[in-house]
Every structure is written in C-alpha cells, then in structure tokens.
C-alpha cells in the first residue's frame, strides 16, 4: 500500500518524463481518435513526442521562456496533448480554459495570471474578439488560419534538439481556475510534484490502468478532470487513450465502448445515468471493460445496478476536487458498500473533522478535510492568501463537502456545506432524496434543494426532469412523493415538486443547486410581499 513518502517526487522533476519514457518503445500507440463524422486518426508515443518537441521549439523561437503562463483553449483533438506537453516540458504553465468561457472570464484570467500567450483552436477564436486585453498576448491558433493569429502548427521549428527545462517538483505546472461560491474564480496552483502524486494515487489503485489497456476518459481539455485522467493518468501509465471528438449521445457512447473494446472507462454520473436508460442494452458487448469509474458527484445505486446486471461491471465512485486529487474512492480491491464514497486513498491523509478541527467519531457528520502535508494537495490560491486561510482549520484544508465515516472507515457523502436541508429540526442531505426520485421510471434527472417555509424553516423541494415532459400532472406529483416515502425516511420526501425541462448546470455538468436555492428564496420572498 502506498505511503505518503511514495507520493513525493524527486527534487529535480518534470512530469513530462512520465510520458516521454514510453516513446522509446517503438510504435507503441498513445492515442486513438474519432470524431462525429467517423474520421479516425492515431498517434504513437514517438509521434506524440515529436509533435511535442516541435511545438516546444516553436514556442521558444517566439520568445516564450520558463515560467511564462499560456491560456490553452482546445477541444478533444490530438494536438491538445502535444500542446500541453510542450508547455510543461518547457517549464511554462498551462492555464486550461473551456470554450464556454466568455470575454469577462478570459479578461480576468489574463490580468490575474499575467498571461503571456494563448493557444486557441480556430473555431474558438471568436471568444477572444471582445477581450480587451487580448492584444497584449502572443496569440497562436490550431486548425484553420485566422487573421491576426499565427498558426502554431505551421511554424517551421526544429524539435530534434528541444530539451526538457530544468524544473523542480515545486515549480508551477498548471494554474486552473475554479468557481467559488462568491467573488472571482480561484486560481489553483498545481506543481510538477502534485502531478507525480496524482498519477501515483489515481492511475493504478482507482482507474486500474495498465500499459496494455485502452482507456476512455470522457472529460474535455479545459477542465481539471481532463488533466487528471485523459492526460496524466492515461499517458503517465503508458496506456492507449481513446478520444471521441463529438457531442454526448448515450447510445453512441455505448456503441464506441463496444467497437473499440474499451478496457477502462471514466465518465460523469450524468453520462452513466443517461446510458443506463438506453433501451436494449443487451445489444452492446462491453466484455472488454474491466474497470469503470465515476467522479464529480455521487452515483445513484440504480445506475450501478444496471451496469452490474447488463455488463457485469461494477461502477466505482471517486471523490476529489480541483485543489487536490482523488481523495476518497472505491478502489479496485475495496469491497463495495452501495451508496458509500469508499475510503481515503493510500498516502493521502483525508479525515472528517468537526468545527474544532478534531477528527469526528464514526457516524458523526463533519467536514471532509485534507491534511496540509498531503503531497497531492495544491500549493496555493494564486495571489490570494486570504482565501486560502478561510479554508484552513488547524492542520487541515477544508474541501467544502460534508460526510460521515462508519466503523470500517468508509465515507458517506452528505452534501456540500450549503446544500444541507434543515426541515423541522431534521438534517436532510439532497442526494438521498434525488437517489430515490431517479429510481422512478418517469424521472430522467432531478435536483433537490431547501425551500423556505414559515412553519418548518425549510421544506424539501424537488426540481424534476421527466423522461416525457408531457406526462407532468398532479397525480404524478403524488406518485413521486409516495415513491420517495417508500425508499427513504418519510420525513425526507419532497413536499413540493416542480417539473422542468432542464436543470441549471456548470460547464462541467454539475448541477447548480445554488441557483435553484436562490430561485426558491426569491419566489417565497415575492409571495410574502
């Protein structure tokens, strides 16, 4: 079992070494790629490093140097991997950005991080048209040529002599911005040493990746989860990464899993939920799949049961955050307790603590916290030491999530700190109610929040997306309420249900319960007025 010291990188270290070592193995396949039209391409590790070195040399010729920060906004294309590797091998810093960002988002990042350049896929350049600070940057495109942007891949550069920068484990590698509940996004500083610790933590024990595996992790570049799995865990293990450059369609995903004989699969709970509802699952042969994991939010028991029944695979949960790594998970050899988050990952000191910073007793709900000495914890919030202080309690960094631990050390998720519902003195976690609701065949997805109530303080309110929106009715409301009462404690049932066509979500597909809570507060305030 891994210990903390096993997660500490050598003092002189560059994470690209983890991938580059596989380029010596002849034509070992690094990446398989397909887009919506069916076009296919593949790169070996040797080809990947050739492209990496060419891009790195081109960036050096343009005047970039160690420590410079570059915004990278690229989709699921093979060049994304080479761009990231080139920047990191150069000792520079990647700022991952989603194409969903708007001008104000980009302006903040450019100013706050003192960005020197931007590498952007041609289809996304429009996002920079209204960015007032874009003229300060060296702007480089990938794909079609665009006026005012230099095409990075067309630059003639000799990569044969491109060398790895002299970096240490404490040098910044990534600056990832993550939303806070208030104020501007937080700039999360990850070092090369963090990448080493993350790779050791997640690739083997959780994802269960070996060199011979074909791995599909569905996250897109621009998000920390892409850095976690498709980039670090897959390439750092010498495996073959499958990349699908297309929109999510549940049936299409199942067809690709079947056709490419995927061995390891990692996707969001939302994607699993929608795949589980596809009719005729017996059409798909997923016998090559030996590992399936989910991260982002707890996965419903019913979905886990569907994959077990039809494909003989146990979907295992994992929990982490932008600031850290896989902190808690159902590891490959850990007995599954349905509904549990699993146990803390080896080498990472993760606890549940109370308001005094003391470790909670089994069964006591507290804050999930990471010891500050954990190697896979981020270095700091960039230029924001005060925000860092607000999330430290004693020797621990607070994740913002609450849970309880049982006698065997399994963690059981309760809620985000601000998602907990207190109704008539009862403490209710929204996930339990949501998990019950989605077991009903008419429910596609749902979100549960607190709604202000003069008598009870708050009541449980459910926003429900139906499989068929035309079936909404008062009768169905009563059916769903009774359904929940039969599955979980009756006091937890949703006293109000509202049918909606969609739920508000973050760009990474997490439900924005905070938006729904604010809506409820406003609605109740208007009724009082």
Swiss-Prot record:
InterPro entries: AMP-bd_C (IPR025110), AMP-bd_C_sf (IPR045851), AMP-binding_CS (IPR020845), AMP-dep_synth/lig_dom (IPR000873), ANL_N_sf (IPR042099), Mitochondrial_ACSM (IPR051087). This is Uncharacterized acyl--CoA ligase YtcI. One of its GO terms (molecular function) is CoA-ligase activity. The gene is ytcI. GO terms for biological process: acyl-CoA metabolic process; fatty acid biosynthetic process. Its EC number is 6.2.1.-. It is an enzyme of class 6 (ligase). Belongs to the ATP-dependent AMP-binding enzyme family. ATP binds at residues 178-186, 401, 416, 510. Keywords: ATP-binding, Ligase, Nucleotide-binding. It comes from Bacillus subtilis (strain 168). It holds the Pfam family AMP-binding. NCBIfam families: AcylCoAsynMbcS (NF047394).
